[in-house]
UniProtKB/Swiss-Prot annotation:
GO terms for biological process: symbiont-mediated suppression of host innate immune response. The keyword Transmembrane helix applies. Induction: Expressed in the late phase of the viral replicative cycle. Belongs to the asfivirus minor capsid protein p17 family. Together with the penton and the other minor capsid proteins (M1249L, p49), forms a complicated network immediately below the outer capsid shell, stabilizing the whole capsid. Three copies of p17 encircle each p72 capsomer in the inner capsid shell, anchoring p72 capsomers on the inner membrane. Required for the assembly of the capsid and icosahedral morphogenesis. Additionally, inhibits the host cGAS-STING pathway through its interaction with STING1 and subsequent interference of the recruitment of downstream components TBK1 and IKBKE. It comes from African swine fever virus (isolate Tick/Malawi/Lil 20-1/1983) (ASFV). It is found in: Virion membrane; Host endoplasmic reticulum membrane. It is a single-pass membrane protein. It comes from the Viruses. Keywords: Glycoprotein, Host endoplasmic reticulum, Host membrane, Host-virus interaction, Inhibition of host innate immune response by virus, Membrane, Transmembrane, Transmembrane helix, Viral immunoevasion, Virion. The lineage of its organism: Viruses, Varidnaviria, Bamfordvirae, Nucleocytoviricota, Pokkesviricetes. This is Minor capsid protein p17.
């Protein structure tokens, strides 16, 4: 009696073993019966995987290029950045318009007022 055709003997195998053998048998049977169709299907699957990888690489490179090639603002344009979080009180923070950051050059009128006073 053949073990593949006997339902009682194949039932004694574990379920996983039985499914594995049935799947392998079906796949081998299909490949042996239709080698051309199987080759075409495998070729299509391989091409799809290659195309998917290429699309993923191009998409990733495009997103990286978009981030790195953002137009730079002119130097006179100031970007407000959020201040970093410090653990000391607010009054110790640097002021944005402090005299150390901006050089204040007095005009001639202001110099004349200082001389007269």
């Amino acid at each position: 009696m053949d073990t593949e055709t006997s339902p009682l003997l194949s039932h004694n195998l574990s379920t996983r073993e039985g499914i594995k053998q049935n799947t392998q048998g079906l796949l081998a049977h299909t490949i042996a019966r239709h080698p051309g169709i199987t080759a075409i299907i495998l070729g299509i699957l391989i091409l799809l995987v290659i195309i998917l990888i290429i699309v993923a690489i191009v998409y990733y490179n495009r997103s990286v290029d978009c981030k790195s090639n953002m137009p730079r603002p002119p130097p006179s344009y100031s970007i407000q950045q959020s201040e970093p979080h410090h653990h000391f009180p607010v009054f110790f923070r640097k002021r944005k318009n402090s005299t150390s950051q901006q050089a204040h050059i007095p005009s001639d009128e202001q110099l004349a007022e200082l001389v007269h006073s």
